[in-house]
Amino acid sequence: MAKKIVVLNGSPRANGNTKELVKAFVKGAESAGNTVQVFDLQKMNIHGCLGCCMGGKDEASPCVQKDDMALIYPAYREADVVVLASPMYYWGVSGQLKCAFDRLFAVAECMPGYANPIKECALLMAAEGDTADNFAPVKAFYEGLAGHLSWKNRGIVYAGGNFAAGDILNKPAQLSEAEKLGTEI
C-alpha cells in the first residue's frame, strides 16, 4: 500500500550532504509508489516553541504562532511516515529540525481528543565524524522520541565522514543506503 511520507530536512545548507541523502531517500520511496513531501526547513520561517501550551484548540491552526509551520501541520497529520533529516551539530540534530519538531507538540500532544496516530519514522543523518560513538546521542534522542510517540522505527542512515557540501557524492554506498530505506518503506 502506498504511503504518505513527510520529510523534515533540517539542513541549513541548501545543497549539503543531508540534502543528497534526502534526494536518494525520495528517489527510493517514490519508486516504490509512495508520495513524498519534503519540507526544506532552512527556507521556512519557523519560530521556536513558546512552551505556552495554548495550542491545540483549532485543528486548522493548532499553534498560536502564525508562521510556516501552518504548511507542515496538515501534511504531518496525514502522513503515514515522518522522516527526520539533519546534519549532526554538536552531537545532535540541527536547530532548524529541533525547532520545527518542537512545534509539532501543538498537534501531537495538545489537541483535545486528538490521539497521536501511530506513525512510522526514519532518520537520515550526515556528519563529519564517522564512528558509532559520534551518533550515539542522536540515536538516543531519536529512539526516545519514537518511543514516546509510539512510532515504529523503520530505519536510520548514518552517513559519516562528510563535511564539505558534496562530500557524500563520493560515497555512493551511503546514498544507496538512503535510497534502499526509501524503497523499503
Model region roles, listed by residue range:
Residues 35-40, 151-159:
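Short beta-strand elements in bilobed, periplasmic/extracellular small-molecule ligand-binding domains
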Residues 73-76, 89-90, 114, 142, ...:
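Sequence-level detector for tyrosine residue identity
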Residues 1-107, 165-185:
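N-terminal beta1-alpha1-beta2 submodule of the flavodoxin-like/Rossmannoid cofactor-binding fold
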